[in-house]
Swiss-Prot record:
Record keywords, A-Z: Acetylation, Membrane, Mitochondrion, Primary mitochondrial disease, Transmembrane, Transmembrane helix
Quaternary state and interactors: Component of the ATP synthase complex composed at least of ATP5F1A/subunit alpha, ATP5F1B/subunit beta, ATP5MC1/subunit c (homooctomer), MT-ATP6/subunit a, MT-ATP8/subunit 8, ATP5ME/subunit e, ATP5MF/subunit f, ATP5MG/subunit g, ATP5MK/subunit k, ATP5MJ/subunit j, ATP5F1C/subunit gamma, ATP5F1D/subunit delta, ATP5F1E/subunit epsilon, ATP5PF/subunit F6, ATP5PB/subunit b, ATP5PD/subunit d, ATP5PO/subunit OSCP.
Protein's UniProt name: ATP synthase F(0) complex subunit k, mitochondrial
Gene Ontology CC entries for this record: mitochondrial inner membrane; mitochondrion; proton-transporting ATP synthase complex
Transmembrane segments annotated in the record for this chain: 23-45
PTM annotation (N6-acetyllysine): residues: 16-17
Alphabetized PANTHER family for the sequence: ATP SYNTHASE MEMBRANE SUBUNIT DAPIT, MITOCHONDRIAL (PTHR34038), ATP SYNTHASE MEMBRANE SUBUNIT K, MITOCHONDRIAL (PTHR34038:SF1)
UniProt topology in membrane: Single-pass membrane protein
Length: 58
């Protein structure tokens, strides 16, 4: 058999239905969740407030 397996072949329930390594949709959701979490971490560190030092060195 050439090509991806059909989604009807696997009967997943719960979170495994959306995040698995057997179906194309499951793999896509894993990739999107990974990229999304990396983007959120980058945005958090870019946008967090920069604290000014208590004593400025002159």
């Amino acid at each position: 058999m050439a090509g991806p397996e059909s989604d009807a072949q696997y009967q997943f329930t719960g979170i495994k239905k959306y995040f698995n390594s057997y179906t194309l949709t499951g793999r896509m959701n894993c990739v999107l969740a990974t990229y999304g979490s990396i983007a959120l971490i980058v945005l958090y560190f870019k946008l967090r407030s920069k604290k000014t030092p208590a004593v400025k060195a002159t």
